[in-house]
Amino acid sequence: MNETAADRVAPRGFTELPDLAVRSLGGAVIWADDEFFAEKENLIVPEAPEFRPATYGHRGQVYDGWETRRHRGLPGDDAAVVRLGVPGVIHGVVVDTSWFTGNYPPAISLSALAIDGYPPAADIAARTDWVPLLDRVPVRGDARNPFPIPSRDRWTHVRLTMHPDGGIARLRVHGEGRPDPALLGLGPVDLAALENGALVLDCSDRFYGSPHQLLHPGNARRMGDGWETARRRDDGNDWVRIRLAGPGLIRLAELDTSYFLGNSPAAARLTGRTTDGTEVELLPRTPLQPDTRHRFPTAAVAASVEEVRLDIYPDGGLARVRLFGELGG
């Protein structure tokens, strides 16, 4: 069987894949049955959880997470529903109980749904057709609890259940974006967008920032919202490989160095790999400016490209990469 770009995912653990639920990708915690001690929205904050001892509010110690009241032997469990910022295939989750020591749940479970449209949150929570992805499993307190998920279906929402109650700092839902196929093909598309199904396969260096952020929606908000490499002390250069949303024809490349001032690359080059394995040059080595959204027309290529490699010279940081074109071709 011929290898495709979809098969060439870097052989790392699932935590190297993007977090589909994170707030910066548009994720939202749309419902929870209880959030007495700490708000449900904290579950998907992109930053790591923090703790300030002896910091009390009207309801006790302040926790950076989602925390419910004690059940005290009463029946029932607590649950929260998360709408994924990028619907997709879930490869694994991390249930992070950092700083929750005497108040973490003994066990959790996870289920999912694929929903069309935008029904009310209460209607979604009340549905009875949730599909189990993770049966009831024990978790440790003050720890990152990773769980691989074998499902390869596309999901839009997940439901996290605590058995019976307690607190969780963060929920990370790692996977690959899968867009609504009904929306693709309606016009030009960003073939490098995570929300359209693109994925970073590999990169030379990720010292200061994750390369997955290159494919995030919207503009970067600060330097840390992009990909930045360490300073090179050799004659090489840094690079990143991206699997496109699907085979297509790239017409326009946007290379955004916003917020990178003294650390933007001096130049960049873009090459593509067609569906038959041929390498083609889409953008020759081209100078870049600091803190600038560059837009370059790409070379006309007759065959569809399914994967690209962006080389930066010699190192530095980029905020976003956009590759506009059409699927197919």
UniProtKB/Swiss-Prot annotation:
Pathway entry: Nitrogen metabolism; (S)-allantoin degradation; (S)-ureidoglycolate from allantoate (aminidohydrolase route): step 1/1
Single GO molecular function: allantoicase activity
Enzyme Commission identifier(s): 3.5.3.4
GO biological process: allantoin catabolic process; purine nucleobase metabolic process
Pfam assignment, any one: Allantoicase
Coiled coil: none
Catalytic reactions of this protein: allantoate + H2O = (S)-ureidoglycolate + urea
UniProt keyword annotation of Transmembrane present: no
Keywords, sorted A to Z: Hydrolase, Purine metabolism
The keyword Hydrolase belongs to this UniProt entry's keyword annotation: yes
InterPro entries noted in UniProt: Allantoicase, Allantoicase_dom, Galactose-bd-like_sf
SUPFAM superfamilies the UniProt entry points to: Galactose-binding domain-like
Family classification: Belongs to the allantoicase family.
Protein name as annotated: Probable allantoicase
Species: Nocardia farcinica (strain IFM 10152)
